[in-house]
Amino acid sequence: MELSPLQPVNENMLLNKKKNEDGKKRLSVERIYQKKTQLEHILLRPDTYIGSVELVTQQMWVYDEDVGINYREVTFVPGLYKIFDEILVNAADNKQRDPKMSCIRVTMMRNNLISIWNNGKGIPVVEHKVEKMYVPALIFGQLLTSSNYDDDEKKVTGGRNGYGAKLCNIFSTKFTVETASREYKKMFKQTWMDNMGRAGDMELKPFSGEDYTCITFQPDLSKFKMQSLDKDIVALMVRRAYDIAGSTKDVKVFLNGNRLPVKGFRSYVDMYLKDKVDETGNALKVVHEQVNPRWEVCLTMSEKGFQQISFVNSIATSKGGRHVDYVADQIVSKLVDVVKKKNKGGVAVKADQVKNHMWIFGNAVIENPTFDSQTKENMTLQAKSFGSTCQLSEKFIKAAIGCGIVESILNWVKFKAQIQLNKKCSAVKHNRIKGIPKLDDANDAGSRNSAECTLILTEGDSAKTLAVSGLGVVGRDKYGVFPLRGKILNVREASHKQIMENAEINNIIKIVGLQYKKNYEDEDSLKTLRYGKIMIMTDQDQDGSHIKGLLINFIHHNWPSLLRHRFLEEFITPIVKVSKNKQEIAFYSLPEFEEWKSTNPNHKKWKVKYYKGLGTSTSKEAKEYFANMKRHRIQFKYSGPEDDAAISLAFSKKQVDDRKEWLTNFMEDRRQRKLLGLPEDYLYGQTTMYLTYNDFINKELILFSNSDNERSIPSMVDGLKPGQRKVLFTCFKRNDKREVKVAQLAGSVAEMSSYHHGEMSLMMTIINLAQNFVGSNNLNLLQPIGQFGTRLHGGKDSASPRYIFTMLSPLARLLFPSKDDHTLRFLYDDNQRVEPEWYIPIIPMVLINGAEGIGTGWSCKIPNFDVREVVNNIRRLLDGEEPLPMLPSYKNYKGTIEELASNQYVINGEVAILNSTTIEITELPIRTWTQTYKEQVLEPMLNGTEKTPPLITDYREYHTDTTVKFVIKMTEEKLAEAERVGLHKVFKLQTSLTCNSMVLFDHVGCLKKYDTVLDILRDFFELRLKYYGLRKEWLLGMLGAESSKLNNQARFILEKIDGKIVIENKPKKELIKVLIQRGYDSDPVKAWKEAQQKVPEEEENEENEESESESTSPAAESGPTFNYLLDMPLWYLTKEKKDELCKQRDEKEQELNTLKKKTPSDLWKEDLAAFVEELEVVEAKEKQDEQVGLPGKGVKAKGKKAQISEVLPSPVGKRVIPQVTMEMRAEAEKKIRRKIKSENVEGTPAEDGAEPGLRQRLEKRQKREPGTRAKKQTTLPFKPIKKAQKQNPWSDSESDMSSNESNFDVPPREKEPRIAATKAKFTADLDSDDDFSGLDEKDEDEDFFPLDDTPPKTKMPPKNTKKALKPQKSSTSVDLESDGKDSVPASPGASAADVPAETEPSKPSSKQTVGVKRTITKGQSLTSTAGTKKRAVPKETKSDSALNAHVSKKPAPAKAKNSRKRMPSSSDSSDSEFEKAISKGATSKKLKGEERDFHVDLDDTVAPRAKSGRARKPIKYLEESDDDLF
C-alpha cells in the first residue's frame, strides 16, 4: 500500500506493525490533525517562545552574596529566567517613556512570589474603545497585544513582539497587575490564575498619588520541572537586578528592600573586575567613555579570549551582536596598527587575535532593535539603523592602547613565535641528520661521545675545503664541518619571520641540537647537544671578524649560558708568512708583522707572502695548521658581565649612541698612538691561547665597525669613499687617452688598487661617478660615453657595463692636480702601493657632488652645491672675506629650492596653469624620477583607488630623457579645488630636505660632525691652503734640484768644449775625483728625492731604467753619482744641443725664481682660474653635443621648432608659485630641535676625544641609557624613491649626475633672478604635513632625494660672484652653445648657473649671452662667469629684463620676485634666448615680453636628447655600490 505524502509519520509506523494489530481501533483523523489555541500552543511548545524549559548547566555570570558577581557553572531553566527578565525589562523600559522615573523595586518572597515595582508613568487606566476592555487587562491578559507594533515610530525600549509580559502570565500560577495613573485618576488591579486561563475580578479605585506599576507573579514551577526557586536561578535573577541598576541611568534599584550599591555603568563594571589582576599582578586598567547619551563603553584586558557584557535598551545581550561588533571593530582596527608597529617582523597578527585579548562592556540605547529570537540574546539590527553612532574618541583609543591589551597581545605573539621556533628544534638527539646540504657531520655527533665533538663553521665553501684537508690530520670522528654562506643574521634585531625563514640559523640549530629557551647551565643539559663546541673558521680580515661577532651574538642572545662553558672557539690562520732559506715565521696580525719588521733591519731579505683569506692557504698548509691545533685554536673565555655588556654594545639597536662613543674613542685612541709613534694594539700574538669576549669586541670587531664607516662615509678632503678613490687612482695611473669599457676599467682597478670586493659593485661605482643627469653629480669625474642612466629611472636604466665606455673627464686632473700627488700619503696593500689616504682637490668635492652613506653608529647626508658658488666662496676666503651662504643646487634643475630653517630646505617642482581644465608640470622635485612619478602619482590620480576617486581625466607626456613635461587634464571643479588646496601639494611637487647629519672623516681619519656647509668649506680651506704651502715647498726643492742639474750639465758641456775637462781614456774613479774637485754636484735630483724618502708615483716605474745601475750597486749608493753628466750623448757637444741646454738652464732658473715670488694663495687662484676656464669649455662642448642630435636636422626650421616646443614649457602657462606656509616652517624648526636634542646625546664624534683610555670610557658608556637616534631614510612621497635611498650614491659616486637635464633649457616660467633672501611668496599651498614630515625623517638616508632638486636659492649675495666669474668671460658665449651634455661628462660648474647658456641661440650677441649666462641662473655666487655681475642686478641682462617684463604682465610674477630661490640652471640665459626665438617666430600672440621669456632659438639651443634610457636590470646608483656589500 502506498502512502500519500500527507500521511503523518506515525501512520507510516503503523503500516509496519504486525497483522494482529489490524484489529485494534485505528486513530481518528481528528485526533491526528489538531488545532490548538495560541495559549495552548505556547504551553505545549514553550521553547519557541521562552527557550528551553529543561534544566541546563552552563557557565554564567551570577551574583553570589559572599563573592559578588562571578562566572561559574549554574544549573537553571532558561524559560524561567526569561519570563522574569521580561517583566524586569518592561520596568526598565518605563524609564524611556517617563524620564522622571527613579526607582525599581524587586522582591523575591519565600513562597516563590516575585514582585517588580517601578514608579514610572502608570499604564493608562482607561477602557480600549475597540477591544472594550481596560488597557492594563488588554496588554497583560490578551495575547498579541502591544504598544510596539508601529515600526514607523522610533522606540528605544526592550519590548517588541507583544509576547513578553503575557508569557510570564501564561507560565505563572498567579499573576497580578497593579497600576496607578495620576492622569486618569484611577488605580487598576487584576489577578490571573492557572496559566492565564482564569482571570480574577478587576478592581478599580480612584487615585490621586504618584504613578506606579507593580507586577507580582508566582511562576508555575511544575512547567519548569522545579519545586522551588533554587540558589542558582536566584543568583541569576539577582545579577539581572544589578544589570538594570548599572544599565539604567538615574534609577535606584532595590532588591528585597535593600538598595543595590551601583552608581552607574562604570561602578557596575568594577563589580566584574573586582580582584582581577593582569600578568604582572596589577589590577586591570579600565578605559571608560560616555560617548553620548545613548552609548557608554568600557574596555579592559581579557585573558580568556574575547569577552563582552552588553545591554541593548536594558536587555542583557549575553551573546553580543552587531552593537558589540560595531564598537569592537573600531577598537581592533586601531590596536592592530599599534601591534603591527611594535611587532615588526614578528608573527603576523590578525584582527580576531587582537579581539581575543579584549573585554568590552557596552550599554546602548538603540531604536527598534531586532534579535534572532524571542530570548533576545543576540542583537541583529544593522549598524546603519541604530539611530545613533558611537565614535570613540582619540583619548579613549589612546587609553585603550595603554591599558595592557597591547602588551598582552605582544606577549602572546612572543609565545606563539616561541612555539613556532621550537618546531624548528628537535628535543631528541639524533645520530644522523638529513636534509642539510654541504654538512660533513662528525661520526660521533649525536652519540654518547657528542660532548667531545666540535663543529667547524667555515666562511664559504673554499674554507670548508681547507678544513676538510686539515681533518685528514685530526680525523673525522670528533670534527664536523659546515660552510656558512656569508654573514649570518643579527638575531638580536631580526624579526620573527626573518629568523623562521633563515635557513642558515635553522641549520646550525639542527646540527648542534640546540633548543630555544633551554638553559644549558649544567653538564646534563650540555649532553643533550650533538656537538660540545663550535669552532669558527673565517678569513683573518674585518669581514671575517664580523662573522665571528654575529655568531657570538647569536649564541649570546639565545643561550647566554653556553658562553660560560667555553662553547665557542675560533681557528686562526696566518695573515703574513715570511721565509728565508728553510726558516719560516707566521704572523697572525699585521701590527705584529710591522713590529717584527721594525726590529729586524734585514727584513727585506726575507720573502713575504700575504694571505688574503683561507683560500690562499694550500692543502699542505691546512694539514700543518691542524697538526699544530694548539697554536691555531683560540678559545673564547667568559670573563663576567663586562663580556655581556660588550656584546650588547656591538649588536643592540638600542645602543646606537653608545656605539658612537665607542667608535669615537677608538679613533681618538688610534690617532694618539700614531702621534706618539706607538704600534697598533693587536690580539693574536705568538703566545695567545684564549680570548675574552670583551677583548674580541673592543680590539677586533671594532676594526670591522670602523672599516664599515670608512667604506660608507666619505672624506671631507676629497668627498670620496675608498672604492671611488681606487677608481680615480687607477684612472690617473692609466692616464687613458682613449675611452675604455667600464667592465675593463673595473678589472684594472681591482688589479692596480687591490680592490677585494665584487667587481659588479665596482662597475656600479664607476657608473655612478660618470652619471650626470639631474639629481646625480654636479661634476662627474668620469665621462659617460654611452647610456649611463637618465632621470627617467634615476640611473637604473644604464646599459650593461660591457657595452658602455668611460674615461677621465678633462676637469679631473684640474681638480686633482698631479703636482699635489707628491704631498699625499699613499697606502700599501699586500706590499703594493695603492691609492692615497685621500686626494686633495682644489675645491671641496664633497659639497659639489654631495654625499650619502650609512655606517655603524653614524650616517652622512650632504646635498649638492653649485660649483661656481663654491669657487666664489673660496676666492672670498683667499681674499680674507667671509664666505656667502649657499643653498643646495643641482645641475640643470629648473625648480626652486628654499630654506625653511637652519639646514632644512623645501624643493619645489614646476607647475603652470594653461586654462581652466589643463595644467602642465615641467619639473619634479629632485630625485623624483619621471617614470616613478607617473606610476606612483599620476596613474592613481587617473584611475582612482579603493579609497579615493579619480582626480584627473587624462594626462599626456612630452618629456625627453633630460626634461619633464606632463600636460594634465581635469574638470574645472577639480582644478579649482586643487588650486585652493595648492597644486604643489596635490600633485606632490614639494619635498623637504634635511641636512642635520653632515658627518665626514676629517684629514686625520676621525669622524667629525659639521653643523653647516660653511664649516666644511672652512675646514677644507685651511687644510688645502696648508697643502698649497707643502706643494710650493716640494716644487721649490724639485725645481732647485732640476735647475742645479741643468746648471751642472751646461757647465760640464762648456768646460768639455773648452778642453778644461778631459774624459777620454781615463778611469771612472779618476773622472769622479776631477768632477768633485771642479765643484760638480752629485746628481742633485736623485739626492733631493732620496732626502724626501719617497719616489714620486710617475717615477716608480722608471726606477729600474734610470737608476737601476746606481741603486743596485752598493758602490753607487755609498758614493756620489755623476752618471747624469757622464751618460750624456756625444751630440750634446754640438752647438745646437749646447745652446738648447743653456736655454733650458735659464728657463728652469726663471721658473724657480717665479715660483719663489708666489704665495700659496696665488698658486690656488691660478688653479681655480684654469679649472673655471676648462669648465666653460667642457660645458660648451656638452651643449654642442646635445645640439648635434636635434630632431629634424634636415627638416625645415618651423618643423624643428614645433617639435622642440612640444617638450618645452608652454609660453601661455601661468606659473604657480610654490607656497611655503608658516606651518611648514614651524614643523621644520620642530624637527631641528628634535634632531639637535638627539645629536647632543651622541656628541660630535671628532670631539668626544679620548681623555681616559678607550676601555674605561667604553665601560662607563655601556651603562648609559641607549640613545634614540635612529636612522631613517628620507623618502619622497612615492615608493620608488625609497629604493633610491638605499644607495648612498649621492654621497660620492653619483654626485655628478646632472648633465642630462640640460638639453633644452627652458626658462622657468616667470621666475625672476634671485635677489633678496627668503621672502618668497607662494600661491600654491604646500602639503607640509604629508610631504614634509615624511621626508625629513628620512633625513639620514633619503634626505638627499629632496636635496637634489633645489636650484632656487633663497640666499642672497650676487656681489661676490663677480670676482669668481672673471675668468669665465670668454666662456659665456661658449656656454650658450654648449648646452648639450650628452656624451660629455657633466661639467661640474654647470649646476645652475651654467645651464642658462643653453638656451642662447647662436644668434645672440656675446654680451647678451653673458648676461643670460649661467651667472644668473646659477645663483648667488656664480664664480666664474663674467656675466655674474649682471646677475646681481637682473635688469642688466636681456633675459632679466625680459623676465621682468613678463612678470609685470602677470600677477604671479611679482611674488616670484621675492623668493629669490635658486633658479634652474639655465633659466636666465635661456629666458633671453627664448624670448628672441619667440618674437622672431611671431607664432605667439603674447606680448613681446612674454614671448621672449619663453622663446628659444630652437635651432641652436635645444636638441632633443639623443640618449634614450635603455631598459635593463636596474642599477642602484643611489649609493656607492661598494657599500652594498657591507
From Swiss-Prot:
Residues 1097-1109, 1326-1346 have a biased composition (Acidic residues). Residues 713-1168 form the Topo IIA-type catalytic domain. GO terms for cellular component: centriole; chromosome, centromeric region; condensed chromosome; cytoplasm; DNA topoisomerase type II (double strand cut, ATP-hydrolyzing) complex; male germ cell nucleus; nuclear chromosome; nucleolus. There is a cross-link at residues 17, 154-155, 350, 384, 395, 414, 416, 423, 438, 464, 478, 527, 582, 597, 612, 620, 623, 630, 637, 653, 660, 674, 1073, 1193, 1201, 1237, 1272, 1279, 1282, 1359, 1363, 1369, 1381, 1418, 1438, 1450, 1455, 1480, 1488 (Glycyl lysine isopeptide (Lys-Gly) (interchain with G-Cter in SUMO2)). Residues 1417-1427 have a biased composition (Polar residues). Homodimer. Interacts with COPS5. Interacts with RECQL5; this stimulates DNA decatenation. Interacts with SETMAR; stimulates the topoisomerase activity. Interacts with DHX9; this interaction occurs in a E2 enzyme UBE2I- and RNA-dependent manner, negatively regulates DHX9-mediated double-stranded DNA and RNA duplex helicase activity and stimulates TOP2A-mediated supercoiled DNA relaxation activity. Interacts with HNRNPU (via C-terminus); this interaction protects the topoisomerase TOP2A from degradation and positively regulates the relaxation of supercoiled DNA in a RNA-dependent manner. Belongs to the type II topoisomerase family. This is DNA topoisomerase 2-alpha. It comes from Rattus norvegicus (Rat). The lineage of its organism: Eukaryota, Metazoa, Chordata, Craniata, Vertebrata.
